Amino acid sequence: MLSSKEISTSRMGKEAVIETTMNEALIRLIRSLSASFSNQEQAFENPPLYGNILVRLRPLPQLDPGSLLLEQAYAIASNEPYRVRVLQPTVCPTRGLLILNYAIRDDQRFWGSVEDPQRRSQLTAADLTLLEGCSYQVRETDEGFRGEVEPGCRCLVTRRGKTSYLVSSFELTDDGMSTIDRGYDPATHEHLWGSIAGPFQFKRTDDHSAEIPHHWVTDLKNTGGTVLGNGEDR
């Protein structure tokens, strides 16, 4: 029979293995997200149903490890993104892999900076506001990663002057990414906007993972991503 000390040591060993595995998954997620994507092929095949959209994410070395600038824009107006965010993959001890979702104050200042390192470097933690209820819960799969906006109908967005809650999911692989976003009425749960023809299918066009600073990898291995959040202890 094992002594209490042996049981405690065994438990600590298992927890260390789980933490190491989660840290490695976090680093893989950050690397996989650090890329540019386009659904050009899908848009050209189905022009009535899908616009040609660019999704571009690049590391922000001046912010906490994992922080990525996201710009989402129509290809015909690539420097006028309709969505600008900072995403930060991290690990929560009780919830596993998460992607925190930040709004940027006066985000128009940074339009197009995904392709402009100098302007990108001016983004600071003071410019960010965490969007409560809009984090993505992520799990690793055989093909890559799958994520969904956390449950609770708390991720509120406004489109055309009407408030809705967001239901969003994605699948990320070596080849690309599929996403689906839909908005629902908070009172009636009626579907208000979003794809009715199925997910957007994006192909990976550029890899930006070489821009990930080495100290991020070191810090994430040491902390497990649990004390991150651009100034917040999460």
Give each language-model segment a name.
Residues M1-A16:
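N-terminal amphipathic/basic-hydrophobic helices that include classical n-h-c signal peptides
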Residues L2, E6, N23-S36, Q40-Q42, ...:
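Calycin-type beta-barrel ligand-binding domains and close structural analogs
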Residues I18-E80:
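Short N-terminal edge-element motif at the start of the domain
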